[in-house]
């Protein structure tokens, strides 16, 4: 019985445990964890605080987009992922603006479950691995950590790599084309694939802004010195996290570090220039 609209746990085979005194998250995956039945009743979230509405809604959107480009995605999971994304873009701002809006609450509660169905079959990706790492280390709510990372990981996955994640289900790299497809379905416009991806990222950023979510790790009050000192542990934790194993692009350690520094500064392409000089390759 979900009491937030975001995790989709009621239909997934996943669980997360805290370890090392709450400084590390460990993901468990086994179909014995999947509930036999789920009661998805929006009455349980009608009094959900606005901040948790935003955090968990961002988690829902992250589930949808990561399932969409996963190496384990298929037409069945794609349909669920895109339906969840559409519902989130339409109803999350309304649920956040007016927590008593029953239609918005109901649709977001269902969107979270639908996204859960998508990623319980397709899994998630590097966004979750990174969010788990710094979220556990600095006590950041999971959905908020995902929200900060999402624009950066979409850009990262949309850049066609020289080496992508091997899978019997993947014959060529297609994450950029699937993001472009998502932009088409969301009615964001654009001609070339690159334009559509840029429009998708911009739409995600506008949505996060409308929810008053922090757009950088620095906004959480974590100093650059604290973040830099934690970086070796964060990169190791992210690399050890199984979430990225289904990511379309195989991340290198230096790429995980770069993504974390981009998220630390936040806000679009200028974040690339925010990586401290001593960490640049």
Where are these regions (language model features)?
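Flexible, glycine/charged-enriched surface loops at secondary-structure junctions
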Residues: 72-80, 95-107, 122-127, 164-165, ...
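Gly/Pro-rich interdomain helix-loop hinge
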Residues: 144-229, 269-270, 275-281
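Glycine-rich phosphate/pyrophosphate-binding beta-alpha loops
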Residues: 6, 113-146, 240-245
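Short alpha-helical scaffolding segments that buttress acidic/His motifs in well-ordered protein cores
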Residues: 61-65, 108-116, 130, 150-154, ...
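C-terminal and late-domain segments of enzyme folds
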Residues: 50-114, 118
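A glycine/threonine-rich phosphate-anchoring loop and its flanking beta-alpha core
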Residues: 1-75, 160, 174-181
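Short, amphipathic C-terminal "tail helix"
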Residues: 226-281
């Amino acid at each position: 019985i979900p009491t937030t609209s975001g995790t989709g746990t009621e239909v997934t085979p996943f669980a997360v445990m805290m370890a090392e005194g709450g400084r590390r998250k460990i993901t468990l995956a086994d179909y014995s964890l999947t509930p036999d039945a789920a009661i998805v009743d929006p009455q349980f979230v009608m009094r959900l605080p606005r901040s948790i509405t935003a955090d968990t809604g961002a988690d829902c959107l992250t589930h949808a987009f990561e399932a969409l480009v996963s190496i384990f995605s298929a037409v069945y999971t794609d349909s669920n992922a895109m339906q969840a994304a559409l519902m989130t873009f339409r109803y999350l701002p309304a649920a956040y603006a007016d927590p008593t809006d029953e239609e918005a609450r109901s649709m977001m509660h269902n969107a979270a479950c639908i996204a859960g169905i998508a990623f319980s079959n397709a899994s998630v990706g590097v966004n979750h691995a990174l969010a788990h790492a710094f979220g556990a280390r600095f006590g950041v709510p999971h959905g908020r950590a995902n929200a900060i990372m999402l624009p950066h990981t979409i850009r990262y996955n949309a850049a066609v790599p020289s080496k992508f994640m091997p899978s019997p289900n993947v014959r060529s790299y297609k994450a950029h084309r699937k993001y472009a497809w998502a932009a088409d379905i969301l009615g964001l416009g654009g001609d070339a694939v690159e334009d559509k991806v840029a429009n998708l990222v911009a739409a995600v950023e506008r949505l996060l802004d409308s929810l008053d979510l922090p757009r950088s790790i620095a906004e959480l009050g974590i100093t650059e010195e604290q973040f830099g000192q934690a970086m070796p542990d964060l990169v190791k934790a992210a690399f050890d996290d199984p979430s990225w194993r289904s990511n379309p692009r195989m991340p290198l350690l230096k790429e995980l570090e770069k993504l974390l520094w981009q998220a630390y500064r936040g806000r679009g392409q200028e974040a690339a220039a925010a990586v401290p000089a001593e960490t640049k390759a």
